[in-house]
């Protein structure tokens, strides 16, 4: 039976439910005020703010409770002389006189009341005393100065309070705005299996590193699989490699796959301005990690804290070294029973302390390099997922056109392609967008606002054409895939020379070819305009660096020999990266300079000779560049189909007196298999009759290079003579000097020559 509305329930439960519902309603003012007060109390600024408010209250109270108002000294003396004062009190030391008047003192419309005070200077003390004696006062008192407890407290606590607030503020800044005592705590972020972001399936192109880290995951998931064989879980894994190759991404994948708590921290988060903070944070990090059954600690950019000790000005008292010492102890110290695996990433493994790299700390050191062609294709497919890609886009070809690109570069290419498509209001990402994105990543955005006059465009066209033509005429250079005279980044134009496959080493002949086509732009300017420009400065720098490395690093100079000249990088302050120390004599340095000069001159002469022999093709290429501004691989191949190629380079020996041999290398099993397949497919041939060997041919001297005959104009004769008129006659140029070892920085993944 129900209870009528408005009547109390017999057992009294109904009002109780109403009160409980009211108390649990989050929208009630009472609940909101409680939450606000709780938030206010837990705020890091609550206690210093409260102290400031209390001190201000004391100051205001002391200010507003002043018993009397001040009047001028002459007014006070006049009141005494006029017998208007009832009682007086002199405060010795303050030179202050407090007066109690018989009636209110008024000055104009201002009523001062019956309590006033005035101050006097020492010379007028006698005058004040005489006025007191003649005033007929009811009471008169001399009182020494007594500082009030409140005033003493304020004067004592105010400096302490200000210093405390300043200290609180500084500690809050150091500790990221948290409480004062937390600045020595670890700054690591903890991730659990409930918050996975990246999986191993999201990582591509680094299969070896992925396999090693998957094994770490198996160590944590199934330790019995390894411990039954006596294997121990590795203490640490060091990931090293160039920037952008995916070291941090691999760590994120481990965090998503591990199934154990994952702590992430940067190496720079350990060291602060206060001594001992770094070591304290290391202890706190490992203490927290060891409290879990198993955990992974990831230290990004560990070179910030793990640099070699004993280097620099700090010595043993360096705060960074104390932090490193604590890290060494935590990873493999006296307490060897640890369930923590440390994963670290760096792109400077050469500067790390040897004690950090030894087995027992970082047992595994995994190199993460730029991906190969297959890896680049996999990375492109990962980053293409979720993007509308046109059916005409072949990611395998895109991977082929991007040698040397890291995972970050490829991700940037796909993102730039998407941005360019959105800028043009497109719906799908096509080849044009991807091609432009590759150019933007390699050379920067196109400078459409940089307008060159016709002469500069012509100089740029011949300059880039010189690079491309020399590269096409050499036997050991990669194919030319693109030429453009559109300004991009800091360059006025550029030529792409891309290998068909990934290369991991460079031969001497390839280095010579690199130097020759690097000098092709300068040679073309000299031949055509007889007035070279500053656009070849970058080319000369690259060729010089290549020549220097050939002589001093690669042992490719017959004069210097197979000697490594120049010491390792010195370590003055930063644990590496200093200037290279010269550990050879001045006489050897002079020989090195002479060899570098000879290599550069030979490369320049070779480029000059190639352009003279192919001047008609150079003019045709320059005209096409002026007309279209950008030429792609198929168009370039059509122009270069009649290029007069240079002969194969001679065999080179580091010492001329060594015995020469022409025995070829053995054939690889794959080559033998291909020959066997061809022999099975080819029809049986009739037996051949052996022929006696021919007599050795007589060496005939080669005539000097003759100028090319005049050719028909490419366009009408009224056009610019450097492009449209027939090829001009040029005097004979001597053949390149005796073959010398030359250098070029080994560009294993393609080359790009810029004019800018």
Curated annotation (Swiss-Prot):
For this chain's record, the cofactor binding note is: Binds 1 zinc ion per subunit.
Gene3D superfamilies named in the record: 1.10.8.60, P-loop containing nucleotide triphosphate hydrolases, Peptidase M41
Q: Which GO terms describe its biological process?
A: protein catabolic process; proteolysis
Q: Where in the cell is it found?
A: Cell membrane
Enumerate the cofactors the protein uses.
Zn(2+)
Keyword field contains Metal-binding: yes
Keywords from the named record: ATP-binding, Cell membrane, Hydrolase, Membrane, Metal-binding, Metalloprotease, Nucleotide-binding, Protease, Transmembrane, Transmembrane helix, Zinc
Q: Which GO terms describe its cellular component?
A: plasma membrane
Q: How does it sit in the membrane?
A: Multi-pass membrane protein
Which ranges of this chain reside in the Cytoplasmic compartment per its record? 1-44, 170-756
Comp. bias intervals (Polar residues): 744-756
Chain positions covered by the region annotation Disordered: 647-756
The name of this protein is ATP-dependent zinc metalloprotease FtsH
Question: Source species, please?
Answer: Rothia mucilaginosa (strain DY-18)
């Amino acid at each position: 039976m129900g209870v009528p509305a408005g009547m109390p329930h017999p057992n009294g439960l109904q009002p109780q439910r109403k009160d409980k519902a009211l108390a649990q309603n989050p929208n009630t003012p009472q609940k909101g005020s409680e939450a606000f007060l709780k938030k206010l109390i837990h705020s890091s600024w609550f206690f210093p703010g409260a102290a400031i408010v209390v001190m201000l209250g004391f100051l205001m109270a002391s200010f507003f409770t002043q018993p009397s108002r001040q009047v001028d000294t002459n007014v006070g003396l006049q009141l005494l002389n006029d017998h208007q004062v009832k009682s007086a009190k002199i405060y010795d030391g303050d030179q202050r006189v407090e007066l109690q008047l018989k009636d209110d003192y008024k000055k104009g419309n201002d009523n001062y009341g019956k309590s006033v005070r005035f101050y006097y200077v020492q010379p007028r003390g006698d005058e004040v005393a005489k006025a007191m004696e003649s005033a007929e006062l009811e009471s008169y008192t001399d009182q020494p100065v007594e500082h009030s407890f409140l005033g003493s407290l304020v004067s004592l606590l105010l400096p302490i309070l200000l210093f405390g607030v300043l200290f609180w503020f500084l500690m809050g800044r150091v500790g990221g705005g948290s409480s004062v005592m937390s600045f020595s705590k670890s700054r690591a972020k903890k991730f659990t299996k409930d918050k996975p972001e990246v999986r191993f399936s999201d990582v591509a192109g680094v299969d070896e590193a992925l396999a090693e880290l998957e094994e770490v995951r198996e160590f944590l998931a199934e330790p019995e699989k390894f411990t039954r064989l006596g294997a121990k879980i590795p203490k640490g894994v060091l990931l090293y490699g160039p920037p952008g190759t995916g070291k941090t991404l691999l760590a994120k994948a481990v965090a998503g796959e591990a199934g154990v708590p994952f702590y992430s921290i940067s190496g720079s988060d350990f060291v602060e301005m206060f001594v001992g903070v770094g070591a304290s944070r290391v202890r706190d990090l490992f203490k927290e990690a060891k409290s879990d059954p198993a955990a992974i600690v990831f230290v990004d950019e560990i070179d910030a804290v793990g640099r070699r000790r004993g280097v620099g000005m700090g010595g043993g008292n360096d705060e960074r070294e104390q932090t490193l010492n604590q890290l060494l102890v935590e990873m493999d110290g006296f307490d060897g029973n640890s369930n923590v695996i440390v994963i670290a990433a760096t792109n400077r493994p050469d500067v790390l302390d040897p004690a950090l790299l030894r087995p027992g700390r970082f047992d595994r050191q995994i190199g993460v390099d730029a991906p190969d062609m297959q890896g680049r294709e996999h990375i492109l497919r990962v980053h293409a997922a979720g993007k509308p890609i046109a059916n005409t886009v072949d990611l395998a070809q895109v991977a082929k056109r991007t040698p040397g690109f890291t995972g970050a570069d490829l991700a940037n290419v796909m993102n730039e392609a998407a941005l360019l498509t959105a800028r043009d209001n497109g719906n799908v990402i096509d080849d044009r967008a991807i091609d432009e994105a590759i150019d933007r990543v390699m050379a920067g955005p196109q400078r459409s606002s940089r307008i060159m006059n016709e002469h500069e465009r012509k100089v740029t066209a011949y300059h880039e054409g010189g690079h491309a033509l020399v590269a096409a005429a050499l036997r050991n250079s990669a194919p030319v895939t693109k030429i453009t005279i559109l300004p991009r980044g800091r360059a006025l134009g550029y030529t792409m020379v891309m290998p068909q496959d990934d290369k991991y080493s460079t031969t001497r002949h390839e280095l010579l070819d690199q130097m020759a086509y690097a000098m092709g732009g300068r040679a073309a300017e000299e031949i055509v305009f007889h007035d070279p420009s500053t656009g070849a400065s970058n080319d000369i720098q690259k060729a010089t660096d290549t020549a220097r490395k050939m002589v001093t690093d690669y042992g490719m100079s017959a004069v210097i020999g197979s000697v490594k000249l120049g010491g390792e990088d010195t370590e003055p302050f930063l644990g590496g990266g200093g200037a290279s120390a010269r550990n050879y004599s001045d006489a050897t340095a002079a020989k090195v300079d002479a060899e570098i000069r000879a290599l550069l001159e030979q490369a320049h002469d070779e480029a000059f000779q190639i352009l003279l022999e192919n001047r008609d093709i150079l003019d045709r290429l320059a005209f096409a560049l002026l007309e279209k501004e950008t030429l792609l691989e198929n168009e370039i191949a059509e122009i270069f189909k009649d290029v007069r190629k240079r002969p194969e380079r001679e065999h080179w020996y580091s010492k001329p007196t060594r015995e020469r041999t022409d025995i070829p290398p053995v054939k690889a099993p794959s080559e033998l298999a291909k020959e066997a397949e061809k022999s099975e497919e080819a029809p049986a041939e009739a037996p051949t009759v052996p022929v006696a060997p021919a007599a050795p041919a007589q060496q005939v001297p080669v005539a000097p290079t003759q100028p090319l005959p005049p050719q028909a104009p490419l366009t009408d004769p009224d056009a610019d003579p450097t492009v449209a008129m027939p090829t001009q006659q040029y005097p004979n140029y001597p053949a390149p000097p005796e073959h010398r070892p030359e250098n070029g920085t080994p560009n294993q993944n393609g080359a790009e020559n810029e004019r800018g």
